[in-house]
């Protein structure tokens, strides 16, 4: 079984057994609020994405990349976007299907591994919404290249990205214990740490990989915001461990 398959199975289990925060679909009431223009979405754990980062949704073709769960895509649909969601977790996609059926709207649901070429034609989308998820893949730069390929000229890429700080520290977030890069495929200690926490396979990525990767793909970065991880000692000390970015093709 590939590490990607293990991660998908892990996320399915988190949703079934652990009431995972990012696997909870929005309620009917939240959907109605979005229809009435009262909405917010997240790319990273705490901060909401500024509305001005999106522009007008009406008639825009939007891809939620590794964005299953029924949290953001229903909102974008309510605001007038034509949405596609790609994820590798069956449970995350089932949440999307459930909300779409409940609220009676159409969404294109695609099960695919984002480490492979994305199953879309060139210049298919106006917006790609890519919340924190590339911590579950080893190489991020090919994903940014694929995003550039499938976005229309002038299209917007919105990303939630974790920093290396998340992977430096021990479980209590009190000591720096791991050297970088954090890669359980190459480091037994990293693998054992993740197995102890039932965290699947996760990987650190540098700013050169994540910001530089977008620039190398051809994007122009227009906005960056810091964020914390929402809980734990690093959060309590207001240490930023995530960033959200807006880039344009």
List each language-model region with its residue ranges.
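A short SAM/SAH-binding and catalytic strip from SAM-dependent methyltransferases
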Residues: 126-141
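Core SAM-dependent methyltransferase catalytic element
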Residues: 217-219, 233-249
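Conserved alpha-helix/loop element of class I SAM-dependent methyltransferases that forms part
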Residues: 25-60
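A short glycine-rich, Lys/Arg-flanked "PGG" loop and its adjoining helix->strand segment in the class I
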Residues: 141-156
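A short acidic, Gly/Pro-enriched loop at the edge of an enzyme's catalytic core
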Residues: 115-128
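Short alpha-helix
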Residues: 201-224
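Conserved class I S-adenosyl-L-methionine
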Residues: 156-189
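Class I SAM-dependent methyltransferase SAM/SAH-binding core
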Residues: 60-117
